[in-house]
From Swiss-Prot:
InterPro entries, per the entry: DNA-dir_RNA_pol_insert, DNA-dir_RNA_pol_RpoA/D/Rpb3, DNA-dir_RpoA, RBP11-like, RNAP_asu_C, RNApol_insert_sf
A Pfam family assignment: RNA_pol_A_CTD
Keyword line: DNA-directed RNA polymerase, Nucleotidyltransferase, Transcription, Transferase
NCBIfam families with a match to the protein in the record: PRK05182.1-2, PRK05182.2-5, rpoA
Name of the protein in its database record: DNA-directed RNA polymerase subunit alpha
Gene that this polypeptide is encoded by: rpoA
Record family assignment: Belongs to the RNA polymerase alpha chain family.
Entry text on domains: The N-terminal domain is essential for RNAP assembly and basal transcription, whereas the C-terminal domain is involved in interaction with transcriptional regulators and with upstream promoter elements.
Length: 353
């Protein structure tokens, strides 16, 4: 099957992702991507927003059990709020949980006191992010003993769905909002490329509950879309990028064949990573890992690169951006690489230029 790589390689791609933090950068940030082909701002913005709000994993309280309370329409002596108000406040607790649930949490307080989320006795793998959230107020001599059940999930789950079949008397299920993303807004504007104004500028504002940073939330949503869309790609990159065969010309094709898109990409594979104009740190890491040609580099996965000593996320993003400008990426499979006469082929290619 012949694959025309121009379908995706010749589309205009953003130069980079600009981040603008607003106030608390761990909770709210704005991202700008430009230039995009006309229509891609709306396509990407709407898709990312829907995934951000619906599909990210998080933790939430699913039920509570209060001592001496049989149902949510009860009231407690010495507690200013009724149980319904307490449930509404508990729903706003932001939890960061490592591992799977469900987990049990305890909250005990004696009045007079303002009971906050920070008073919850959490284990080492559970962290309450909004510790100043007020749950209720206790008068002098009043006591509150509450057991909370927390679990992990995605999206929004109603209290009815959180009620176990064998729920004991006094167990009050709670609506669970698992999504760590609280608000997402996007805006699409015109932007200039040279003298042309027919391109999109996507501005995406993300606000989270603090359990995940806006930058990570955006990365997770993009990865979800990437994983879902992979089903629709019925060819692999090897069909578009043919590895240079032994004895082939510098372009990697047979003698007399016209140079197509695959041949142009083969030229990139034969270039040395020294020609990528990377930062000194990134270049040294590649050199220490014995990565000489771009063909060697693109076969490495992100995980393999991050295991390289002194190689961090900043260097990884730099390399991914450079490869993307050539229509390449990490984690590619190139059958027959490296060719036996790679040095001769690379030298011949260098002489041509």
């Amino acid at each position: 099957m012949a694959v025309n790589a121009k379908n995706w390689q010749e589309l205009k791609k953003p130069n980079g992702l600009e981040k603008k933090s607003g106030g608390d950068g761990k909770r709210k940030a704005t991202f700008v991507a430009e230039p995009l082909e006309r229509g891609f701002g709306l396509t990407l913005g709407n898709s990312l927003r829907r995934v951000l709000l619906s599909s990210l994993q998080g933790a939430a309280v699913t039920s509570i059990k209060i001592e001496n309370v049989l149902h949510e329409f009860s009231s407690l002596a010495g507690v200013r709020e009724d149980v319904t108000d307490i449930v509404l406040n508990v729903k706003q607790i932001a939890l960061k949980m490592q591992g799977d649930g469900p987990r049990r949490l305890q909250l005990s307080a004696t009045g007079p006191a303002e009971v906050t989320a920070g008073m919850i006795a959490a284990s080492g793998d559970i962290e309450v992010m909004n510790t100043d959230l007020v749950i209720c107020h206790l008068d002098d001599g009043a006591t509150l003993n509450m057991e909370l059940t927390a679990d992990v999930g995605k999206g929004y789950v109603t209290a009815a769905a959180n009620r176990p079949v064998d729920a004991p008397i006094g167990l009050i299920p709670v609506d669970a909002l698992y999504s760590p993303v609280r608000q997402v807004a996007y805006k699409v504007e015109n932007t200039r490329v040279g003298q042309e104004l027919d391109y999109d500028k996507l501005t995406l504002t993300i606000e989270t509950d603090g359990t995940v940073t806006p930058e990570d939330a955006l990365a997770y949503s993009a990865r979800i879309l990437q994983d879902q869309l992979q089903l629709f790609v019925h060819f692999d990159d090897g069909m578009a990028i043919s590895a240079p065969a032994a004895g082939a010309g510098a372009a990697g094709g047979a003698a007399g064949e016209p140079e197509g898109d695959a041949n142009q990409l083969n030229r990139y594979l034969l270039k040395k990573v020294d020609e990528l104009e990377l930062s000194v740190r990134s270049a040294n890491c590649l050199k220490n890992d014995n990565i000489i040609y771009i063909g060697d580099l693109v076969q490495k996965t992100e995980a393999e690169m991050l295991r390289t000593p002194n190689f961090g996320r900043k260097s990884l993003n730099e390399i991914k951006e450079v490869l993307a400008s050539m229509g390449l990426r990490l984690g590619m499979e190139i059958p027959g690489w490296p060719p036996e006469n790679i040095e001769e082929m690379a030298k011949k290619l260098e002489q041509e230029f």
